[in-house]
Each structure stands twice: as C-alpha cells, then as structure tokens.
Amino acid sequence: MHNYFLRTLSRLLSLELVERSKESKRRLDEKPLTMLKIGVLGAGHLGKIHLNCLKQIEEYALVGFFDPAGDTAKAVEEETGIRAFASIDALIDAVDVVDIVTPTIRHFECASKALQKRKHVFIEKPIVATPDEANALKKLADEAGVKVQVGHVERFNPAFIAAESFIGEPLFIEAHRLALFNPRGTDVPVVLDLMVHDLDILLTIVKSPVSHISASGVSIVSPTPDITNVRIEFENGAVANLTASRLSMKNMRKTRIFQKGAYIAIDFLDKKTEIFRINDEVDETNPLSATITLADGSERQITFQMPEIHPINAIKTELESFYSAIVHNTTPAVTIDDGINVLKLAYRILDAVAESAAKVKK
C-alpha cells in the first residue's frame, strides 16, 4: 500500500512537472522573439509622453534620450530615471530604432543622421519642414533599406478605428480642428501644426487625386497663419472643407463624412463615433430609427448607431505597430510616402493661402 501511494504520488508529480514545462514553453513562445533598443530625440512635452509610452512597451528596450537643452535633459533624467545621452550621435549609435520628437525644423537633421547609420526611424508629424527635405529623406530611407513610420496619430484614434469600416466612398467631408492658444507649435503655420492631422485622415479615406484647392488664412498673434480654411476638390467629385485654428475658445476635433446612404460623425477629442444610415425598407421595431416621407410619397428609414469604442492609448499603439512592422518586415501603418503626400498637400494649401492674401492686399 505504501509503495502504491509513492508510485501514484510520483506519477502525479511527473504530470505536474510536464504541465509546468508546457506552460513555461507556452510563455516563452508568447514572448517577443526580438527586443529592439530604442532611443528618443527630444524631451519636450510630446517627447516625455513618448518616453512614458515606451516604458510600457515590453518589446522595446528604452535605452535613453537626447535633448540639446541641458537643463531639460537633466530634469527629465531625474524625473524618469531614463538616461540622458550627451549627443545625438551617441544615442543613435546605441539603438536599433530612433524616435524623433523634436521641433519640426530639426526633423530632417535628426532623421538623416539616423538613416545614414541604417537605424529604423519613427518621426513625428509633419514628417519634415519642407517638400525638398521630404524628397531628400525619402532617398536616404530607400538607400538605408530600413523602416520609417510617421506619427500621424489620429489613424490610431479609437473613434476613427470604430468608424473606418463604415466609410465607403465619401462625397463631402467637413472637419474642424480648433485649439486653445498655446505658444508651443507656433513656429509653423497652423496648417502644419494642426490641419495635417485632418489632411492625413482625408487622404486615407478619399482614394483620388486632388484637382483643385482654394484657401484663406489669417495671422493674428504669430508670424504665420493661426487660422486657415480650405476647400479641397478631388478628381472623383469628392469635396472637403477643413478648418484649423489655434485661437479658439474651446478645443474641438470633429469630422463629418457624407456618403451615399450614410452620414458618419467622428469626435476625435471625446472618442465618439455616430453612424446615421438611410434604409429603403422600414423596420418599425428598431427603436434607434426614424421614418421620413419624401416628396414623392416614398418612405425611408434613418437608423442610428454608436459603434463600440475600445479605449486605447493612440501614441502607445502607433509605437507598438512600428515594432511589429520592423520585426515582421511589413509595411508601416503610416509610411514615409503617406507623410510626404500630407506635407505636399499642406504646402499646396499654404500656397493657396498666400495667393488669397495677395488678392486681398490688392
């Protein structure tokens, strides 16, 4: 009896060890195969947000950051415990991936140094300061053969993600991006500071070349336009009306999309999406609907839907997506070409604003 008990206990222990081994292997298999070393260039407001997000992503090994302002670098190092490097080159040499969160005017300098050393580059929007810099950066990226992703973060906004599957062929798009005044960002026109977010969304959902642009803008407190409105016409007949202002009494980031049989409202700020659809058949049992009678006597039903919004940190998610693109050798979610196309459209708008201003002066 004693021997039987010992044999049974031994078998049970063996089975438990096997199961533990399987569980351990499963956990190992679930762990990322590659740990990428990453460093951040720029430790200002947005740079600190990136540092905080990267600390939460276990697939990245956050090596450190560089900021040319010594006092800022020291303060951030003491606050976060993340190493402050003494130079850009020292940081780039120590990492696999460079995350560029500097003022736009320094994007090209930082990105070109990283690409020349064949480092993967995540670069905040706008991609660089001018179209000429964008073309030069594209050439460097192609020569380096590495991944580049641009930080057009609204692609990762949960409200847009919830709306995306409902968007077909937009006919009219209206966007308002208004912000309280903040001196940060006034080194560039509001088109490059704020409107670029909506330009990226616009080029994502309208699959047609731009045919005509008319725009106007006003400089009130900074040397460049603080408020701009633009009408963009596409070759497929779609029209967009965009307004961006950094002198508003309240913050607003709303886009409305009108297409055949549907109207989609996206609130990027409050993370809400509303879908209104027109149905030919009337379902009187649907409580979230209203029936309308047209001039010819026919009836249509308008149904209302609010898709579920999955709360995510958009910046953290875009950085995670870049990791995935690198290790799986896939196309980044927001490519260098996407960033260049947005920048070139922004400059066409700036040219239209200047042309409009010249007419007013006459």
Question: Model segments located where?
Answer:
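Beta-loop-alpha module in the N-terminal Rossmann-like domain of NAD(P)-dependent dehydrogenases
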Residues: 50, 80-138
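C-terminal helix-rich "cap/oligomerization" subdomain common to oxidoreductases
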Residues: 90, 97-100, 317-362
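Hydrophobic residues in well-ordered beta-strands that form the structural core
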Residues: 86, 123-124, 148-150, 174-175, ...
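A contiguous active-site-proximal alpha/beta segment in oxidoreductase catalytic domains
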Residues: 128-185
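N-terminal Rossmann-like dinucleotide-binding module
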Residues: 5-9, 32-79, 202, 362
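Mid-domain beta-loop-alpha active-site segment that forms a flexible
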Residues: 151-158, 181-212, 225-226, 339
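Contiguous beta-strand/loop segments that form the cofactor/metal-binding neighborhood of enzyme cores
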Residues: 199-278, 308-330
